[in-house]
UniProtKB/Swiss-Prot annotation:
Function: Produces ATP from ADP in the presence of a proton gradient across the membrane. The catalytic sites are hosted primarily by the beta subunits.
Lineage: Bacteria, Pseudomonadati, Thermodesulfobacteriota, Desulfuromonadia, Desulfuromonadales
Originating species: Pelobacter propionicus (strain DSM 2379 / NBRC 103807 / OttBd1)
Catalytic activity reported: ATP + H2O + 4 H(+)(in) = ADP + phosphate + 5 H(+)(out)
A cellular component term, taken from the record's GO annotations: proton-transporting ATP synthase complex
Family matches, as SUPFAM superfamilies: C-terminal domain of alpha and beta subunits of F1 ATP synthase, N-terminal domain of alpha and beta subunits of F1 ATP synthase, P-loop containing nucleoside triphosphate hydrolases
Protein name as catalogued: ATP synthase subunit beta 2
Transmembrane segments: none
Record has Cell membrane as a keyword: yes
Binding site for ATP: G157, G158, A159, G160, V161, G162, K163, T164
Topological category with respect to the lipid bilayer: Peripheral membrane protein
Cell compartments where the protein resides: Cell inner membrane
Oligomer status and interactors: F-type ATPases have 2 components, CF(1) - the catalytic core - and CF(0) - the membrane proton channel. CF(1) has five subunits: alpha(3), beta(3), gamma(1), delta(1), epsilon(1). CF(0) has three main subunits: a(1), b(2) and c(9-12). The alpha and beta chains form an alternating ring which encloses part of the gamma chain. CF(1) is attached to CF(0) by a central stalk formed by the gamma and epsilon chains, while a peripheral stalk is formed by the delta and b chains.
EC assignment: 7.1.2.2
Length: 471
């Protein structure tokens, strides 16, 4: 079969137009290859993905790497298929890029199978509707916004409130406890963080059960817009072909939208609200609908979602909200109090915070904790203007308990040991429920509030109080 080749007619940044012979246009999403000497010495080293048919036998493509060094008239090869990701157990412990090439300098992947990165979501009849909670070992999450196995979880937060640290702690806790395979997609984040994560995983022994797919901040928008799909293809293989329960971590889903917006502008589409692409909801839907549980296996995804200027109504985070089963909202106000993880206990939600799923006792205590914290929030204006003395005895008690709860929601992390100097804590769900139940019932009203800060279980808080009293 003769190979279908075209030639470059124009290059504008990450967008390359290619002309083919009449009747030989490659399909949308097909991968084309061209040699770019500026990247390295190998042949056909640059992948272009067909995005539009322009008419007059031309296609407009998005480059997956640098286009510096391309010339007009250069020959372009149509591969006749989409970008494909290597799948299977050979990808575990490796770092690959958007086009499935290893970037960890450890030789070829050696996989037997590869899957296209654009696929249909599983049909309704194949999807599973079973709902069960799974424990993360992080108190504030397990108590107030529990995660569902096979669900989609979003970690929302502005710059520097701890999304990546929380996602690294979840990888550490869940991958250790869960013991299954994980896939991590680094979408448009810092290269340094990617390196830190790799080192961290190597040290904790989680690496051999994880496939890492990276497309960092310095990559062209085409790579950042597609790297999440490459990771998803790997996770889908474990779910569909091997019948496993997989964890998919994406850091950061906002960068997927941001890259889509850059690509959209380069393709000449008219922007919609706040300058985002007109296809924002469609692109997000195509990605999110593939992350689901089937009768074969499940994909549980944890996605960090950057919130521009701390505005949750921005179209990018607002579009992601609609797809999620649980949201963990990180708050700058809580981070300023020095309470980490800086999860907002009143803003975070979960679809499975339901007595029929998590049990009556857990549900009742979670609601009591939220009631006390909400009441404290309502009283804060009065305290700020008139002071604590003007409150009734009942309100003073609520404030004291709320401050203890607030501090008890903090917890030392394993991945932050190097910064905090205190060893990380994994708290079992029963211990979390017991601890908050005792605070809410007033059993520890006599203890100082600082005893509850940065501890694991309630027993540790009592122990810390005894130490403070002895000083």
């Amino acid at each position: 079969m003769s190979q279908n080749t075209g030639k470059i007619t124009q290059v504008i940044g990450a967008v390359v137009d290619v002309e083919f012979e009449p009747g030989k246009l490659p399909e949308i999403y097909h991968a084309l290859r061209v040699t770019n000497p500026a990247i390295n010495d190998s042949e056909n080293n640059l992948v272009l993905e067909v995005a539009q048919h322009l008419g007059e036998n031309s296609v407009r493509t998005i480059a997956m790497d640098s286009t510096d060094g391309l010339k007009r008239g250069q020959a372009v090869l149509d591969t006749g298929k989409q970008i494909c990701a290597p799948v299977g157990k050979k990808t575990l412990g490796r770092i690959i890029n958007v086009i499935g090439e290893p970037v960890d300098e450890m030789g070829p992947i050696g996989n037997d199978k590869e899957n296209p990165i654009h696929r249909e979501a599983p049909p309704f009849e194949d999807q599973s509707t079973k709902v069960e909670a799974f424990t993360t070992g992080i108190k504030v999450v397990d108590l107030l916004a529990p995660y569902a196995r096979g669900g989609k979880i979003g970690l929302f937060g502005g710059a520097g409130v701890g999304k990546t640290v929380l996602i690294m702690e979840l990888i550490n806790n869940i991958a250790r406890q869960h013991g299954g395979f994980s896939v991590f997609a680094g979408v448009g984040e810092r290269t340094r963080e990617g390196n830190d994560l790799w080192m961290e995983m190597k040290e904790t022994g989680v690496l051999e059960k994880t496939a890492l797919v990276y497309g960092q901040m310095n990559e062209p928008p085409g790579a950042r817009a597609r790297v999440a799909l490459t990771a998803l293809s790997i996770a889908e293989h474990f779910r569909d072909d091997e019948g496993l329960d997989v964890l998919l971590f994406i850091d950061n889903i906002f960068r997927f939208t941001q890259a889509g917006s850059e690509v959209s502008a380069l393709l000449g589409r008219i922007p919609s609200a706040v300058g985002y692409q007109p296809t924002l909801a469609t692109e997000m839907g195509e990605l999110q609908e593939r992350i689901t549980s089937t009768k074969n296996g499940s994909i549980t995804s944890v996605q960090a979602i950057y919130v521009p200027a701390d505005d949750l109504t921005d179209p990018a985070p607002a579009t992601a909200f609609a797809h999620l089963d649980a949201t963990t909202v990180l708050s700058r106000q809580i981070a300023e109090l020095g309470i980490y993880p800086a999860v907002d206990p009143l803003d975070s939600t979960s679809r499975i915070l339901d007595p029929q799923i998590i049990g009556e006792e857990h549900y009742a205590i979670a609601r009591q904790v939220q009631y006390i914290l909400q009441k404290y929030k309502d009283l804060q204006d009065i305290i700020a203007i008139l002071g604590m003395d003007e409150l009734s005895e009942e309100d003073k008690l609520i404030v004291a308990r709320a401050r203890k709860i607030q501090r008890f929601l903090s917890q030392p992390f394993f991945v932050a040991e190097v910064f905090t100097g205190s060893p990380g804590k994994y708290v079992e769900l029963k211990d979390t429920i017991k601890g908050f139940q005792e605070i809410v019932s007033g059993k520890h009203d006599h203890l100082p509030e600082q005893a509850f800060y940065m501890v694991g279980s309630i027993e540790e808080a009592v122990e810390k109080a005894a130490k403070l009293a002895a000083v």
